């Protein structure tokens, strides 16, 4: 991974394109296989050191076949970078991670299945079918309007389902829902996640 290699060589915090970190030395075979597997046409990485020994890397990929990122697009990313970096440092300031230890090491095919099962079963029988659907779409990053459109319900109904599921699961935010989901995924042995 060119980003990881660059980070190991001292890549500083910031917004970096693949071309910048590879400095024109990217293996064409790696590029072909990576982009064919992901469907991405271009990649940009946000390098976010959050504390000693912990650096987050957030990758954004372009799926359409337009030209490379424009200077304006990169400038906008660089403009929001300080805020994103600050929020990440605030979120990950703890010295100990909050994620549980995995009980299994799934291969790539079973990992996809495990993620799908975990999404469909997060919250267990505490949630209604519709609340589980809303939770699954929240975990996929959809906003209220997109969830409403996907489920054929109103925005207010989505907000009510979100409020109820957060209350039932004692959550206060999407970040807490995501943390709950990750722990659910990590601690359930592959194939043992029960979908209500």
Swiss-Prot record:
UniProt domain HTH luxR-type: residue ranges: 120-185
Domain of life: Bacteria
Pfam families associated with the record: GerE (PF00196)
Database matches in SMART domains: HTH_LUXR
DNA-binding region coordinates: 144-163
Keyword Transcription: yes
One GO MF term attached to the UniProt entry: DNA binding
Family annotation (PROSITE patterns): HTH_LUXR_1 (PS00622), HTH_LUXR_2 (PS50043)
One of the GO BP terms on file: regulation of DNA-templated transcription
Keywords from the named record: DNA-binding, Transcription, Transcription regulation
InterPro entries: Sig_transdc_resp-reg_C-effctor (IPR016032), Tscrpt_reg_LuxR_C (IPR000792), WH-like_DNA-bd_sf (IPR036388)
SUPFAM superfamilies on file: C-terminal effector domain of the bipartite response regulators (SSF46894)
PANTHER family registered for this protein in UniProt: DNA-BINDING TRANSCRIPTIONAL ACTIVATOR DEVR_DOSR
UniProt name for this protein: Putative HTH-type transcriptional regulator in exeN 3'region
Biological source species: Aeromonas salmonicida
